[in-house]
């Protein structure tokens, strides 16, 4: 599927250790005829690995599983366990050039504020669930005020919201399909 997506023009692939598909993603990136620097790969550290003694091994497993020289974006998947220690590990690999950008996923303002206290590098992105019926305005505003890019996961509500009257009306207004 990833190879087909890349062939169709996709240039960003989002994966995670938890999804158990990093090897397939890496193979698609290596096997396609697109220069590596034109493909953006995001992966994430699962919260169970965000404990002292596991963080480095988790990232190294991701990098090895992908079979890539670097990851374009690496995120802390959830604000659970040792966030500060895990962030320090991400900063270390960022400084070594093994991660090009570091960020977080599912962090609310209170989590971002806690991280801000000890972080040397601010998160580049906060990947959060946003869809028409889950706006997360407080988190979006906080991120905008702190130059953190908001990236949506589940922006279509996993497809379940496409038949909602409000969505259908907007689509009809602009002569589009929901």
Question: Language-model features: where?
Answer:
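Residues at alpha-helix caps and immediate loop-helix transition turns in enzyme cores, especially N-
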Residues: 1, 21-24, 54-55, 86, ...
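A short, structured active-site edge motif that brings together acidic residues
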Residues: 36-49, 70-79, 106
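Short acidic/polar active-site loop segments enriched in Thr and Asp
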Residues: 11, 69-72, 100, 124
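Short, well-ordered amphipathic alpha-helices
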Residues: 25-30, 59-63, 90-91, 112
């Amino acid at each position: 599927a990833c190879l087909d997506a890349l062939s169709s023009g996709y240039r960003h692939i989002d994966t995670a250790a938890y999804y158990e598909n990093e090897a397939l993603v890496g193979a698609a990136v290596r096997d396609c005829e697109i220069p590596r620097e034109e493909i953006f790969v995001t992966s994430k550290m699962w919260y169970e690995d965000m404990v002292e003694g596991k963080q480095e091994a988790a990232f190294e497993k991701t990098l090895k599983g992908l079979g890539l020289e670097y990851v374009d974006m690496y995120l802390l998947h959830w604000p659970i366990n040792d966030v500060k220690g895990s962030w320090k590990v991400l900063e270390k690999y960022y400084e070594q050039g093994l991660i090009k950008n570091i960020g977080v996923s599912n962090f609310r303002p209170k989590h971002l504020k806690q991280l801000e206290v000890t972080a040397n590098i601010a998160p580049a992105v906060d990947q959060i669930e946003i869809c028409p019926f889950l706006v997360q305005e407080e988190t979006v505003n906080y991120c905008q005020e702190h130059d953190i890019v908001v990236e949506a996961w589940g922006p279509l509500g996993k497809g379940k919201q496409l038949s909602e009257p409000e969505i259908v009306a907007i689509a009809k207004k602009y002569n589009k399909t929901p």
